[in-house]
Regions:
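A structural signal for the main folded, soluble domain(s) of proteins
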Residues: 36-45, 49, 66, 149, ...
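Low-complexity, serine/threonine/proline-enriched polar segments
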Residues: 92-141, 295, 306, 319-320
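Short, hydrophobic, well-ordered secondary-structure elements
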Residues: 60, 70, 163-181
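Short helix/loop segments within enzyme catalytic domains
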Residues: 177-205
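Post-HEXXH active-site segment of zinc metalloproteases
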Residues: 72-114, 150-155
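Active-site-adjacent bridging/hinge elements
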Residues: 36, 137-154
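Active-site metal-coordination segments of metallo-dependent hydrolases
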Residues: 159-172, 208-214
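Non-catalytic terminal regions of proteins
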Residues: 1-63, 72-76, 194-423
Length: 423
């Protein structure tokens, strides 16, 4: 059995991952012999009332990795990443060395993902339970201005976790993965019973307690610490909302948010450096982190009940804009969306202007259609039944089969999205 070699610029995970250098998802856990399980995962029998453990596990994995693909191809952050990446490829293809300007610019985006592994520190291999968080701002010679989350238990420190782009992307993928599982259950049973809610909540708890999964659980830990009484699905919705906002906010509005963040930081030297990075369109993970804390303070000082927060999460962008407005950043949801669309389309025009050898035929058009389909929800699972989709499961023996049809759990998501499995 042959496996595609995992490169440095990939998401973590042994069962599957996205290669950020090519935008291709690789599913390692399954081979072409597992197509029956994959079909049951993608196309559950509606109303069957049969819980299929293997199919649910496959659905979770595919949803997790597909979230990475959509975050890379349908967000303002993702398109900037791809444009810079392809400009670097074009420069190298033309004979430029690795110290060329295009490569250096692309490495700024890569560094935001790579920094997590270089900065995370674990002091005790114990379950993450009954912890509190402390936050610090520091300057790192290699990665610039960094916000660190310190996980404290009693007088001891369990771990230091950087607020990295990787931690934001993985938190969003986990949120979508678990919401996707809930959708699978709803399709099969007609509802998500208390038993399955508790089971999904237990799955999230196991992720949050794992000190070796800090790239996955950092943002989820922040949410459960600050909003302990929200339901499991409201907490997932909140993580998805702040991730979607941070990945899609336009450069102009990012500067407005940077000014608000600036006022919330006491260290004048470091806040200047951090806000300069934000004004250049970098450090979007910091936006998610600070917006989450702004929402917490906004709900506390306005004495919003858990039910009130839950109600506002039905329109998460409105909640985020209300929280920012409370701290002096006047953003209107409709303007946030329109400016985000404008900047995304500008990046698309740049991508079309590059040599097409770095993107497969039809990929740019697929990105645009997927973005339109994803526009009004923070969860990809909420649109699965309404998208137009072709996902190809390609074996390494050069055989392509269309595995997903219009009645699948994924609906019909626009191709080309390629998942490679071993033959």
């Amino acid at each position: 059995m042959r496996r595609i070699k995992k490169l440095v610029m990939c998401s973590p995970g042994d069962d599957g991952y996205i290669d950020y250098g090519s935008s291709i998802v690789n599913i390692v856990k399954y081979t072409s012999r597992d197509k029956k399980v994959l079909r049951r995962a993608i196309k559950p029998k509606i109303g069957s009332g049969r819980f299929d453990v293997a199919a649910v596990q496959a659905a979770r994995l595919i949803t997790h990795e597909y979230t990475h693909y959509l975050d890379l191809t349908t967000t303002v952050w993702g398109l900037e990443f791809i444009v810079r990446r392809n400009l670097a490829y074009q420069a190298i293809d033309a004979g430029a060395d690795i110290e060329s300007k295009a490569v250096e610019v692309a490495m700024l985006n890569y560094a935001e993902i790579l920094m997590h592994k270089g900065l995370v520190k674990v002091y005790g291999h114990v379950p993450i339970e009954d912890v509190v968080t402390k936050h610090s701002l520091s300057r790192n010679e290699k990665y610039g201005t960094i916000i660190m989350i310190h996980l404290m238990k009693g007088e001891g420190r369990i771990a230091d976790v950087p607020v990295s782009m990787l931690s934001l992307l993985e938190a969003n993928a986990v949120a979508n993965e678990l919401m996707g599982e809930a959708l699978w259950i709803e399709r099969v049973f007609g509802e998500v019973s208390s038993f399955h809610k508790n089971r999904i909540s237990s799955n999230l708890d196991s992720i949050m307690k794992n000190v070796n999964a800090l790239e996955y659980n950092a943002f989820h830990l922040l949410v459960v610490i600050h909003f302990p009484r929200l339901t499991i699905f409201d907490r997932l919705r909140l993580v998805g909302a702040v991730a979607d906002f941070a990945l899609n906010i336009s450069g102009m509005h990012l500067s407005h948010v940077a000014n608000t963040i600036f006022r919330s930081i006491l260290n004048s030297t470091l806040r200047n450096a951090l806000c300069n990075e934000l004004c250049r369109g970098m450090s979007r993970q910091v936006v998610a982190f600070k917006v989450l804390l702004f929402i917490y303070q906004y709900t506390q000082e306005n004495e919003l009940s858990d039910e009130g927060v839950s109600e506002k999460l039905k329109s998460p962008l409105e909640l985020i804009c209300s929280a920012l407005q409370y701290f002096g950043c006047d953003l209107q949801a409709v303007n946030v969306r329109s400016m985000s669309d404008f900047e995304y389309c500008f990046s698309v025009s740049m991508l079309r202007g590059l040599r097409r050898k770095f993107e497969p035929a039809g990929h740019v058009e697929a990105m645009l259609r997927n973005r339109r389909a994803r526009k009004n929800t923070v969860f990809i699972s909420e649109k699965f039944g309404f998208l137009s989709c072709l996902i190809f499961i390609c074996s390494t023996i050069s055989t392509s089969r269309c595995l997903i049809d219009k009645d699948s759990i994924f609906g019909r998501i626009m191709s080309p999205f390629m998942m490679f499995i071993a033959s």
